[in-house]
């Protein structure tokens, strides 16, 4: 959420930021509601002051005028409450301001590749896509996944399930033991206010799964619960930075992706992900972003899979982000660069929505923290890259060395 005072004092800057994102936001309506709110507040203050004076007088005229004032105050309080509710809703629909270092671009086609790491493998045969390899090895079962849950669901079997478990364990171990993140295992169902704080609600409700009876929401990413771990808290400067890592399943309706990537396990309603999350001081957040990217890249380096880093343009960064990078692994069977991580600095956008603050000293005024999030990494796209990059001419899959202690085998046949 943006500071209302900032919008009031910098309306053209905010309008330009929204335009650079190639989206829309109700800036004019916010300014009108803000003006109405300020006028109503002033009018209420005047009436309350007048009523206070009348309360000290005992004559019939003053008593009658006091009754009239009570009615007027009640009416204005109701109007102010409605204006406040509308204003809050509209503010929640305004995206974050892109950092000046973010390139302006109209869509993802203009994202900037910063560098490539690792060499693409030279195959002596035509590499197969993961769905062919998975079915032939009996480690992925699409038909039974559809039988159980419908399209965009699948089942991992035997060594396939073990490979995913090995990847998750390896990632969590690396991030907790080497990168010093604290592991969290959060609930998969969270309250509405958690998703408001993370920025998923109200704007993206259509892409979320919801239990309407009890108003629980299935997590679209561990970012949502991690944003709320310190909601409505005031931290000390000594506690920052805080680094969390969490593995969860993630649930998304993918309504915007209807008809896309229908084969394989690239785009699903349920998938698994290891998420990195940071709380830090404002002056440290961009350095923390670079560290987060390096932490995520180390997974790809360890797996020895070619990848590239992209800086996202203004129109492609997420709703709450001020600056984002994507890590994409190369998958030869589908001949695609697959996004396996998006690392973002959300500055104080989520901190303000979640009301997470810190004090630099015990007497200092509380400030909003900056928050960052990133995949470290996202499955099953990492699975796709492992299966396709490590396939052999006979259809078997060699297990990357770093995963062998978790798998107990060197090859899936």
From Swiss-Prot:
- Which terms does the record give in the GO molecular function aspect? ATP binding; serine-tRNA ligase activity
Transmembrane stretches in the record are none
Q: In which pathway does it act?
A: Aminoacyl-tRNA biosynthesis; selenocysteinyl-tRNA(Sec) biosynthesis; L-seryl-tRNA(Sec) from L-serine and tRNA(Sec): step 1/1
- Where, in this chain's numbering, is ATP bound? 252-254, 339-342
Its annotated compartments are: Cytoplasm
- What catalytic activity does the UniProt entry give for this protein? tRNA(Ser) + L-serine + ATP = L-seryl-tRNA(Ser) + AMP + diphosphate + H(+); tRNA(Sec) + L-serine + ATP = L-seryl-tRNA(Sec) + AMP + diphosphate + H(+)
Q: Which residues bind L-serine?
A: 221-223, 275, 375
Question: GO CC terms for this protein?
Answer: cytoplasm
Q: Which domain of life is it from?
A: Bacteria
Mainly localized where? cytoplasm
Q: What is its EC number?
A: 6.1.1.11
Sorted keywords for this record are: Aminoacyl-tRNA synthetase, ATP-binding, Cytoplasm, Ligase, Nucleotide-binding, Protein biosynthesis
**What is the role of this chain?**
Catalyzes the attachment of serine to tRNA(Ser). Is also able to aminoacylate tRNA(Sec) with serine, to form the misacylated tRNA L-seryl-tRNA(Sec), which will be further converted into selenocysteinyl-tRNA(Sec).
> What family is this protein classified in?
Belongs to the class-II aminoacyl-tRNA synthetase family. Type-1 seryl-tRNA synthetase subfamily.
Per its record, how is this protein called by name? Serine--tRNA ligase
* Provenance organism: Dehalococcoides mccartyi (strain ATCC BAA-2100 / JCM 16839 / KCTC 5957 / BAV1)
The primary gene name is: serS
